[in-house]
């Protein structure tokens, strides 16, 4: 059975790229495009891995990550944070909230694939 990745991202080109990269490697990729109800989607789908954009409409990725780490059934789900802002303070905030890995956009296909494989233990 394919492992599931939940991609929470609002940029269509990033969604398309991640779906392409991961589906070719056998991953099932589910997508969600806003922060409003992202945590409800996470709780109902319980993916093997979450790829979470920092800047989303409705709620920031940081707020979503904080809620993920306060939800017992989601504590062990690895979270890869994506951002166009790769400043030290952004990395530190994500790390303090419990991200598993931080990646800046743009990224290469191989960078994304390596990160997902590492985090999901594949």
Enumerate the language-model features and the residues they cover.
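Charged docking surfaces used in two-component/phosphorelay signaling
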Residues: 16-24
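Alpha4 helix (beta4-alpha4-beta5 surface) of REC/receiver domains from two-component response regulators
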Residues: 19, 63, 86-103, 114
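Active-site beta3 strand of CheY-like receiver
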Residues: 45-51, 56
């Amino acid at each position: 059975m394919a492992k599931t990745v939940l991609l929470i991202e609002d940029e269509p080109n990033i969604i398309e790229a991640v779906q392409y990269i991961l589906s070719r490697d056998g991953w099932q990729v589910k997508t969600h495009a806003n922060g409003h109800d992202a945590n409800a989607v996470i709780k109902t789908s319980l993916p093997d891995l979450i790829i979470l954009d920092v800047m989303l409409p409705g709620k920031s990725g940081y707020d979503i990550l904080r809620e993920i780490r306060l939800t017992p059934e989601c504590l062990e789900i690895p979270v890869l944070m994506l951002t166009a802002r790769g400043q030290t303070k952004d990395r530190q905030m994500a790390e303090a909230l419990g991200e598993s890995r931080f990646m800046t956009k743009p990224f290469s296909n191989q960078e994304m694939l390596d990160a997902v494989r590492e985090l999901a233990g594949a």
